[in-house]
Structure formats: structure tokens, C-alpha cells
Regions:
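Active-site-proximal, substrate-binding regions of enzyme catalytic domains
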Residues: 2, 10-307, 311-317, 326-352
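Conserved SAM-binding loop
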Residues: 321
Length: 352
């Protein structure tokens, strides 16, 4: 009986298509290996299979990056059609309202062998910048706002606006360079993002530090680290004099959630960036290029920002999110976003 609706992230989708091609896969989660045949059976017996527009953009880009051609993307595109027809599975693409993959345009151009590669890469780039910018600003602002509140300082709202504009301009410069040079690796992009985060943070702290001193407080000096590592070390140093500083930051985040809920921000979006904030403060985890992609995937079920290609409304309670990426899996599990323990337990072999 076809009764499951499954949302595949990028690597789960590629895993499925390669399995169809009978390639060898060795993927594991929580030290348990994925049972390929069970995963394949679940997908071919699903009611609906979903992927997001950003998965298509990512596969399109990887095809260009590896071969300078769309052949690999075309293969996966053809595999979707074959899979649908072979198993009578409904296969739909979830598109963010501002990040839709223009599938009809691609199909028309593909038939004529005239795919405008630059157009699709630019669409991916623009949307990616928007998502990474959103994460950077939210994480950076949550930290700066907390520090201002912690030391009794009032921040003007125009301060946020200016920082947001600067961040977007610099991110565009970084992404233009990355997507113009096929030799550049994700590690280069990630380093540039961390440097940008550090730039924003330094400017924000330089803005509030004089006011902290005016209020009679001493701001901790942190040396030899920058970016998210600086943030983690700063909080660890604050903890020496205030054992509850991490707890206070968590309470600050809860206050932001309440404020953003009133503004209509979706719950999945908030869960993702709050987890990102906490990982940054608690462990110094960096914001990376792929976080923008992950962010768009995990928030794609929010009805206010999604366009789906199905005829009926999608009940998110009936959807299972499948990912074999450790970070995304942990997010889905920890935050209970489209997570099914029973489904994953069925997919995996016993612990090694």
C-alpha cells in the first residue's frame, strides 16, 4: 500500500538514483549502515516522493563544476521520469516562492539542446546568497543583541539594516567569484563566509564596546581566534564570572522566538537558525555554504513560502524527511522536524 510521503534531501535523492543505477553505496548514520534495499523499497512504494528546487540547482551546479556540461544533471532528470513510470510513484518538486527551479524552461531548452547554463547558475547563486545572508545576520544579531542586553545597552534598529546591506554586498562578491571559477572549492567559500562573519562581529562589537565601558563594565579581550571560534571563547570567558551566561543566552533566544512568531516567521525556520546560534555559541561551529542549502531544504514545508506541484494540500504530519547528512539528520531528530524514528530504524542495520 502506498501511504508514505517522503521528502528526500540532496544526498538521499542521489543515493536513490545511484541505487537504481546499481552503484555501490556505503552510507551510515549513528554508526549504523543504511540498508540499501529497504531504502529503495520504501521509495518505490511511497505515495509521494518530494525533492526541493534547491536540490535540483545543486545537482545542476555539480554537473557543471565536474564536467562543464549538464550531462550528469540530465541523467538524474531522466532517472526521475523513469522511476515515476516504472513504479507509479508520484514525484514532485517543492519550490520556495523566491527560489523556484524553472523546470518547464529547462525542459524546453533541453529538448532544443540550448540550455542557458548561466541563467540557472545565477538563479542558484542569488537564492543561495539570500539564505546564507539570512543565517549570518540572524546568528550575528542574536549574539550582538544578547551582549547589548547583557551590558544594558540599547541598539538602534538602523544599525541592523546597515549591517545587513553590507553583508549581502560582500556575500554577492564572494559568490560571484566562486561561481565564476570552477577550480574554487567549497572550503574556500566556507573560509570567506567565516571571515565575513568575523568582519560583521568585529564591527558590531566595536560599536557596543565603548558603550559597555561607559556603563562601567569591562569587556573581555579575546586573542588568537576569530569568527565563530571567537564567539565560543568569549562566552567561555564570560562564564568564569557568570556561570549562567549560556542559560541567559538560551533565554534570550526564547524571547526572540516569541517576537518572531508574532511577526509570522515559520517554526521550522526558527528551529534551524536557533540551533545554528546555539552551535556557534556552545561549540564555535561555523556557518558554511551548504548551510544555506540545508536551510532551504528543511524549511520547504512551510506553507507560507512554498509552491508545490501537487493538486492537493500537503499534510506535513504525513511527510517523512530522509537525509543521510549527519548535520541535517541531527537537526531533524533533535528538533523533531519531519522525523520518524521508526522509519530510520527500519532502514538501518544493527549497530556495528
Amino acid at each position: 500500500m502506498k501511504n508514505k510521503n517522503i521528502l528526500l534531501d540532496t544526498n538521499a535523492f542521489i543515493f536513490l538514483m545511484r541505487n537504481e543505477k546499481e552503484s555501490s553505496n556505503t552510507i551510515s548514520l549513528e554508526n549504523r549502515q543504511i540498508n540499501e534495499s529497504k531504502f529503495y523499497d520504501e521509495c518505490k512504494n511511497a505515495n509521494y516522493l518530494f525533492i526541493t528546487s534547491q536540490t535540483l540547482y545543486e545537482i545542476f551546479w555539480q554537473s557543471i563544476k565536474k564536467t562543464k556540461k549538464i550531462d550528469q544533471f540530465a541523467y538524474y532528470y531522466d532517472q526521475i521520469i523513469k522511476f515515476k513510470n516504472k513504479y507509479n510513484v508520484k514525484f514532485s518538486i517543492l519550490n520556495d516562492t523566491d527560489g523556484e527551479f524553472e523546470l518547464r524552461l529547462f525542459e524546453d531548452q533541453y529538448k532544443d539542446n540550448k540550455v542557458d547554463i548561466n541563467h540557472f547558475i545565477e538563479r542558484k547563486r542569488e537564492y543561495e546568497v539570500k539564505k546564507i545572508n539570512e543565517l549570518l545576520i540572524k546568528v550575528c544579531f542574536s549574539i550582538t543583541e544578547f551582549l547589548a542586553e547583557y551590558y544594558g545597552i540599547l541598539l538602534l534598529r538602523n544599525f541592523y539594516y546597515v549591517a545587513g546591506v553590507i553583508c549581502e554586498i560582500k556575500l554577492n562578491e564572494i559568490s560571484y567569484k566562486y561561481y565564476s571559477d570552477l577550480k574554487l572549492k567549497n572550503e574556500w567559500y566556507d573560509k570567506e563566509i567565516d571571515d565575513l562573519f568575523n568582519f560583521l562581529l568585529e564591527n558590531m562589537i566595536s560599536y557596543i564596546e565603548p558603550q559597555i565601558k561607559e556603563n562601567g563594565h569591562k569587556f573581555p579581550k579575546i586573542q588568537n581566534v576569530k569568527g565563530t571560534k571567537y564567539v565560543h571563547k568569549l562566552f567561555c570567558k564570560l562564564k568564569k564570572d557568570d556561570k549562567t551566561v549560556f542559560e541567559k543566552y538560551d533565554n534570550h533566544l526564547k524571547g526572540l522566538v516569541e517576537e518572531l512568531e508574532k511577526m509570522g516567521m515559520s517554526k521550522n525556520c526558527m528551529k534551524y537558525w536557533i540551533r545554528m546560534c546555539r552551535r556557534c555559541v556552545y561549540s564555535g561551529a561555523k556557518i558554511k555554504k551548504n548551510d544555506g542549502l540545508d536551510y532551504s531544504i528543511v524549511t520547504c514545508m512551510d506553507e507560507s513560502i512554498v509552491i508545490n506541484k501537487t493538486n492537493n494540500m500537503i499534510n506535513t504530519n504525513d511527510i517523512i524527511f530522509v537525509t543521510f547528512d549527519t548535520n541535517l539528520y541531527n537537526f531533524s531528530k533533535e528538533c523533531d522536524v519531519l522525523y520518524s524514528k521508526k522509519f530510520y530504524d527500519n532502514l538501518m542495520f544493527e549497530y556495528r
